[in-house]
Amino acid sequence: MSVNTNIPPILVRREGAVLVLAIHTPGKRNAISPGLSDPLTEALNAARPDADIGAVVLTGADGYFCSGGDLNVLATRRLLTPQQRRGELGGLHGLIRLLRDFPKPVVASVEGGAAGAGLSMALGCDLLVAARDATFSVAYIKVGLTPDG
């Protein structure tokens, strides 16, 4: 099975003064991999000085917020040194700090599930709005990890 690398991992749109960032990894319930934090961080950093943006909404595409780390990618990382792992996780940890400290309101709009790192991103936001079908799971222990790396 081939992977379409042309699919953007983040969908960005404007709705008036609101910047909407949607995690978009189709077929994986919006699982995240090491490079996913980069486009989110770039979009937030671009929004910071933009006076026309009053708030940010972080959500997931296709009715699911984020299932956490992509287990297929994580399995390939088991041979990394601790320093290499810290480097990869640094982007995600930096993103969560950026969400927490962002100077404009950031709202997590959660449909479906928010698990593992997806839950951490949602909790980094100023406000979390959950749909009736929303579920939340720390999930790390299920795959032998400690929370957030």
Listing of model-derived features with the role each one plays in the protein:
Residues 95-145:
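Glycine-rich beta-to-alpha active-site loop
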Residues 60-97, 114:
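Glycine- (often His-adjacent) and acidic-residue-rich active-site loop
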Residues 31-34, 67, 76, 142:
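Phosphate-coordinating loops and pocket residues in cytosolic domains that bind phosphorylated ligands
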Residues 21, 58, 70, 121-123:
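Hydrophobic/aromatic residues within transmembrane alpha-helices
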Residues 1-61, 83, 97:
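Conserved CoA-thioester-binding segment of acyl-CoA-metabolizing enzymes
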